[in-house]
Amino acid sequence: MEMVLDFFVWFAEAVERRIFTSLKMEATRYFVATFVVFVAVWIVFEGALKTRKLGKMASRRPDARIRQVRREIFYSICSVVVYMVMSIFLFEGAANGVFKFYNDPDQYGTAYRYGSVLLLLLAHDAYFYWSHRAMHHPWLFKWTHAVHHRTKDPTPFTAYAFAPGEAAINFMIIPLYALILPLHDMTTVYFLWFQIFRNAIAHAGYELIPDGWARHPILGLNASVTHHHMHHERMTGNYGFYFTFWDRLMGTEHKDYLDRVDEATKKKAHPEGLSTVTG
Protein backbone atom coordinates (compact mmCIF):
# COMPACT_ATOMS: atom_id res chain seq x y z
CA MET A 1 0.00 0.00 0.00
CA GLU A 2 2.85 2.36 0.83
CA MET A 3 4.41 1.74 -2.59
CA VAL A 4 1.12 2.64 -4.28
CA LEU A 5 0.88 5.86 -2.30
CA ASP A 6 4.50 6.68 -3.10
CA PHE A 7 3.78 6.20 -6.79
CA PHE A 8 0.81 8.55 -6.72
CA VAL A 9 2.82 11.17 -4.86
CA TRP A 10 5.63 10.85 -7.39
CA PHE A 11 3.19 11.00 -10.31
CA ALA A 12 1.43 14.07 -8.91
CA GLU A 13 4.78 15.83 -8.58
CA ALA A 14 5.78 14.76 -12.09
CA VAL A 15 2.50 16.04 -13.51
CA GLU A 16 3.01 19.37 -11.77
CA ARG A 17 6.49 19.65 -13.29
CA ARG A 18 5.74 18.41 -16.79
CA ILE A 19 2.05 18.75 -17.66
CA PHE A 20 2.13 22.13 -19.38
CA THR A 21 5.29 21.35 -21.35
CA SER A 22 3.88 17.99 -22.46
CA LEU A 23 0.46 19.37 -23.36
CA LYS A 24 1.91 22.30 -25.30
CA MET A 25 4.30 20.03 -27.19
CA GLU A 26 1.72 17.41 -28.20
CA ALA A 27 -1.20 19.76 -28.93
CA THR A 28 0.94 22.21 -30.91
CA ARG A 29 2.33 19.50 -33.17
CA TYR A 30 -1.09 18.05 -33.96
CA PHE A 31 -2.95 21.29 -34.62
CA VAL A 32 -0.14 23.00 -36.54
CA ALA A 33 0.54 20.02 -38.82
CA THR A 34 -3.07 19.11 -39.54
CA PHE A 35 -4.21 22.68 -40.17
CA VAL A 36 -1.21 23.48 -42.38
CA VAL A 37 -1.79 20.37 -44.52
CA PHE A 38 -5.56 20.94 -44.59
CA VAL A 39 -5.27 24.59 -45.64
CA ALA A 40 -2.57 23.83 -48.24
CA VAL A 41 -4.25 20.80 -49.83
CA TRP A 42 -7.97 21.37 -49.32
CA ILE A 43 -8.06 25.17 -49.77
CA VAL A 44 -5.00 26.82 -51.34
CA PHE A 45 -4.16 24.14 -53.93
CA GLU A 46 -7.56 22.43 -54.13
CA GLY A 47 -8.14 23.70 -57.66
CA ALA A 48 -4.83 22.37 -58.94
CA LEU A 49 -5.34 19.04 -57.15
CA LYS A 50 -9.03 18.44 -57.88
CA THR A 51 -8.35 15.64 -60.39
CA ARG A 52 -6.17 13.92 -57.78
CA LYS A 53 -8.96 13.55 -55.19
CA LEU A 54 -8.95 9.96 -53.97
CA GLY A 55 -12.28 9.69 -52.18
CA LYS A 56 -15.76 11.17 -52.26
CA MET A 57 -15.46 13.49 -49.28
CA ALA A 58 -15.89 16.59 -51.44
CA SER A 59 -19.20 15.28 -52.85
CA ARG A 60 -20.70 14.41 -49.46
CA ARG A 61 -23.23 16.66 -47.74
CA PRO A 62 -21.59 19.45 -45.72
CA ASP A 63 -23.17 18.23 -42.47
CA ALA A 64 -21.71 14.74 -42.99
CA ARG A 65 -18.26 16.19 -43.66
CA ILE A 66 -18.48 18.39 -40.57
CA ARG A 67 -19.54 15.43 -38.39
CA GLN A 68 -16.59 13.38 -39.62
CA VAL A 69 -14.05 16.14 -38.99
CA ARG A 70 -15.52 16.86 -35.54
CA ARG A 71 -15.23 13.17 -34.65
CA GLU A 72 -11.65 13.05 -35.92
CA ILE A 73 -10.63 16.13 -33.94
CA PHE A 74 -12.33 14.78 -30.79
CA TYR A 75 -10.45 11.49 -30.93
CA SER A 76 -7.25 13.31 -31.86
CA ILE A 77 -7.58 15.44 -28.73
CA CYS A 78 -8.01 12.20 -26.76
CA SER A 79 -4.79 10.95 -28.35
CA VAL A 80 -3.03 14.20 -27.44
CA VAL A 81 -4.04 13.60 -23.80
CA VAL A 82 -2.64 10.05 -23.96
CA TYR A 83 0.59 11.36 -25.48
CA MET A 84 0.76 14.07 -22.83
CA VAL A 85 0.54 11.54 -19.98
CA MET A 86 3.05 9.21 -21.60
CA SER A 87 5.39 12.13 -22.29
CA ILE A 88 5.45 12.88 -18.58
CA PHE A 89 6.78 9.38 -17.93
CA LEU A 90 9.23 9.79 -20.82
CA PHE A 91 10.56 13.10 -19.46
CA GLU A 92 10.88 11.69 -15.96
CA GLY A 93 12.61 8.57 -17.24
CA ALA A 94 15.02 10.65 -19.28
CA ALA A 95 15.80 12.86 -16.27
CA ASN A 96 16.61 9.76 -14.23
CA GLY A 97 18.77 8.05 -16.84
CA VAL A 98 16.28 5.36 -17.87
CA PHE A 99 16.44 6.37 -21.53
CA LYS A 100 19.55 7.09 -23.59
CA PHE A 101 18.74 10.67 -24.57
CA TYR A 102 21.67 13.08 -24.80
CA ASN A 103 22.09 16.76 -25.68
CA ASP A 104 25.83 17.13 -26.33
CA PRO A 105 26.14 16.98 -30.15
CA ASP A 106 29.74 15.77 -29.87
CA GLN A 107 29.04 12.92 -27.47
CA TYR A 108 28.57 10.31 -30.22
CA GLY A 109 29.83 12.34 -33.16
CA THR A 110 28.16 14.02 -36.11
CA ALA A 111 27.97 10.87 -38.24
CA TYR A 112 26.01 8.99 -35.59
CA ARG A 113 23.73 11.95 -34.88
CA TYR A 114 22.69 12.26 -38.53
CA GLY A 115 22.73 8.52 -39.11
CA SER A 116 20.37 8.02 -36.18
CA VAL A 117 17.72 10.00 -38.08
CA LEU A 118 17.64 7.36 -40.82
CA LEU A 119 17.92 4.55 -38.27
CA LEU A 120 14.97 5.92 -36.29
CA LEU A 121 12.96 6.32 -39.50
CA LEU A 122 13.58 2.69 -40.47
CA ALA A 123 12.88 1.50 -36.94
CA HIS A 124 9.61 3.43 -36.81
CA ASP A 125 8.52 2.10 -40.19
CA ALA A 126 9.16 -1.49 -39.08
CA TYR A 127 7.45 -0.88 -35.73
CA PHE A 128 4.47 0.75 -37.40
CA TYR A 129 4.05 -2.03 -39.97
CA TRP A 130 4.08 -4.87 -37.45
CA SER A 131 2.11 -3.13 -34.70
CA HIS A 132 -0.40 -2.01 -37.34
CA ARG A 133 -0.85 -5.57 -38.59
CA ALA A 134 -1.17 -6.79 -35.01
CA MET A 135 -3.93 -4.27 -34.30
CA HIS A 136 -5.91 -5.73 -37.20
CA HIS A 137 -6.12 -9.05 -35.35
CA PRO A 138 -9.72 -9.60 -34.16
CA TRP A 139 -8.56 -9.81 -30.53
CA LEU A 140 -7.06 -6.31 -30.69
CA PHE A 141 -8.97 -4.48 -33.40
CA LYS A 142 -12.04 -3.50 -31.36
CA TRP A 143 -9.95 -2.06 -28.52
CA THR A 144 -7.28 -0.32 -30.57
CA HIS A 145 -7.74 0.30 -34.27
CA ALA A 146 -11.52 0.34 -34.82
CA VAL A 147 -11.85 4.06 -34.05
CA HIS A 148 -9.30 5.00 -36.71
CA HIS A 149 -11.12 2.86 -39.27
CA ARG A 150 -14.43 4.63 -38.74
CA THR A 151 -12.98 6.97 -41.36
CA LYS A 152 -13.13 5.48 -44.85
CA ASP A 153 -12.32 8.74 -46.64
CA PRO A 154 -9.53 10.43 -44.64
CA THR A 155 -8.79 14.08 -44.06
CA PRO A 156 -5.61 15.51 -42.48
CA PHE A 157 -7.49 15.56 -39.16
CA THR A 158 -7.65 11.74 -39.25
CA ALA A 159 -3.94 11.67 -38.40
CA TYR A 160 -4.39 11.21 -34.63
CA ALA A 161 -7.98 9.91 -34.58
CA PHE A 162 -7.15 6.88 -32.43
CA ALA A 163 -8.62 4.99 -29.52
CA PRO A 164 -6.47 5.46 -26.40
CA GLY A 165 -5.01 1.96 -26.80
CA GLU A 166 -3.76 2.67 -30.32
CA ALA A 167 -2.39 6.05 -29.29
CA ALA A 168 -0.38 4.37 -26.52
CA ILE A 169 0.98 1.73 -28.93
CA ASN A 170 1.98 4.38 -31.47
CA PHE A 171 3.75 6.46 -28.83
CA MET A 172 5.98 3.59 -27.71
CA ILE A 173 8.45 3.76 -30.62
CA ILE A 174 10.45 6.62 -29.01
CA PRO A 175 10.85 5.10 -25.51
CA LEU A 176 11.59 1.65 -26.96
CA TYR A 177 14.22 3.07 -29.30
CA ALA A 178 15.79 5.22 -26.57
CA LEU A 179 15.98 2.24 -24.21
CA ILE A 180 18.35 0.58 -26.69
CA LEU A 181 20.17 3.28 -28.66
CA PRO A 182 21.29 6.84 -27.85
CA LEU A 183 19.02 9.55 -29.24
CA HIS A 184 19.90 13.23 -29.42
CA ASP A 185 17.28 15.56 -27.97
CA MET A 186 16.92 17.65 -31.13
CA THR A 187 16.82 14.53 -33.33
CA THR A 188 13.79 13.47 -31.30
CA VAL A 189 12.12 16.87 -31.68
CA TYR A 190 12.71 17.03 -35.45
CA PHE A 191 11.54 13.45 -35.89
CA LEU A 192 8.30 14.04 -33.99
CA TRP A 193 7.52 17.08 -36.13
CA PHE A 194 8.35 15.18 -39.31
CA GLN A 195 6.22 12.25 -38.19
CA ILE A 196 3.04 14.28 -37.61
CA PHE A 197 3.39 16.18 -40.89
CA ARG A 198 3.97 12.87 -42.70
CA ASN A 199 0.93 11.44 -40.93
CA ALA A 200 -1.30 14.37 -41.93
CA ILE A 201 -0.07 14.12 -45.54
CA ALA A 202 -0.76 10.36 -45.61
CA HIS A 203 -4.39 11.20 -44.76
CA ALA A 204 -4.58 14.22 -47.09
CA GLY A 205 -7.14 12.62 -49.41
CA TYR A 206 -5.35 13.89 -52.53
CA GLU A 207 -2.44 12.19 -54.29
CA LEU A 208 0.58 14.47 -54.13
CA ILE A 209 3.45 12.59 -55.81
CA PRO A 210 4.34 13.30 -59.47
CA ASP A 211 3.23 10.93 -62.21
CA GLY A 212 5.58 7.95 -62.52
CA TRP A 213 7.14 8.10 -59.05
CA ALA A 214 5.26 5.11 -57.68
CA ARG A 215 6.66 2.84 -60.42
CA HIS A 216 10.25 4.08 -60.00
CA PRO A 217 12.50 1.43 -58.37
CA ILE A 218 13.76 3.89 -55.72
CA LEU A 219 11.14 6.65 -55.51
CA GLY A 220 8.44 3.99 -55.45
CA LEU A 221 9.64 2.88 -52.01
CA ASN A 222 7.96 6.00 -50.64
CA ALA A 223 4.42 5.22 -49.51
CA SER A 224 2.16 7.62 -51.39
CA VAL A 225 -1.12 9.09 -50.15
CA THR A 226 -2.93 6.50 -52.29
CA HIS A 227 -1.08 3.72 -50.47
CA HIS A 228 -2.60 4.58 -47.09
CA HIS A 229 -5.90 5.78 -48.54
CA MET A 230 -6.52 2.30 -49.96
CA HIS A 231 -5.94 0.85 -46.51
CA HIS A 232 -8.74 3.04 -45.15
CA GLU A 233 -11.03 2.12 -48.04
CA ARG A 234 -10.53 -1.65 -47.72
CA MET A 235 -9.53 -1.99 -44.05
CA THR A 236 -6.74 -4.39 -44.96
CA GLY A 237 -3.38 -4.45 -46.75
CA ASN A 238 -0.98 -1.53 -47.31
CA TYR A 239 0.07 -1.48 -43.66
CA GLY A 240 3.30 0.52 -44.11
CA PHE A 241 3.74 4.15 -43.11
CA TYR A 242 6.83 5.74 -44.67
CA PHE A 243 7.84 3.04 -47.13
CA THR A 244 6.35 0.26 -49.24
CA PHE A 245 9.03 -2.41 -48.83
CA TRP A 246 7.50 -4.19 -45.82
CA ASP A 247 4.20 -4.58 -47.68
CA ARG A 248 6.01 -5.82 -50.77
CA LEU A 249 8.22 -8.20 -48.79
CA MET A 250 5.27 -9.65 -46.86
CA GLY A 251 2.82 -9.67 -49.79
CA THR A 252 0.36 -7.25 -48.20
CA GLU A 253 0.43 -4.50 -50.82
CA HIS A 254 -2.79 -4.27 -52.83
CA LYS A 255 -2.30 -5.66 -56.32
CA ASP A 256 -3.94 -2.66 -57.96
CA TYR A 257 -2.02 -0.08 -55.91
CA LEU A 258 0.17 1.16 -58.77
CA ASP A 259 -2.83 1.34 -61.10
CA ARG A 260 -4.67 3.48 -58.55
CA VAL A 261 -1.71 5.86 -58.31
CA ASP A 262 -1.57 6.06 -62.11
CA GLU A 263 -5.28 6.82 -62.21
CA ALA A 264 -4.86 9.69 -59.75
CA THR A 265 -1.71 11.21 -61.26
CA LYS A 266 -2.57 10.91 -64.96
CA LYS A 267 -6.02 12.50 -64.85
CA LYS A 268 -6.30 15.87 -66.52
CA ALA A 269 -9.06 18.41 -66.03
CA HIS A 270 -11.56 18.64 -68.90
CA PRO A 271 -12.67 22.08 -70.10
CA GLU A 272 -16.20 21.28 -68.97
CA GLY A 273 -15.00 20.39 -65.48
CA LEU A 274 -14.86 16.64 -66.08
CA SER A 275 -11.64 14.66 -66.02
CA THR A 276 -9.99 12.07 -68.17
CA VAL A 277 -7.00 9.75 -67.90
CA THR A 278 -4.13 10.42 -70.25
CA GLY A 279 -1.40 8.12 -71.42
Each language-model region and where it sits:
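Cytosolic/stromal cytosol-facing helical appendages immediately following the last transmembrane segment
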Residues: 1-31, 48, 56-65, 140-279
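Juxtamembrane helix-loop-helix connectors linking adjacent transmembrane helices
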Residues: 85-123
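Core segments of transmembrane alpha-helices
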Residues: 78-87, 91, 95, 162-178
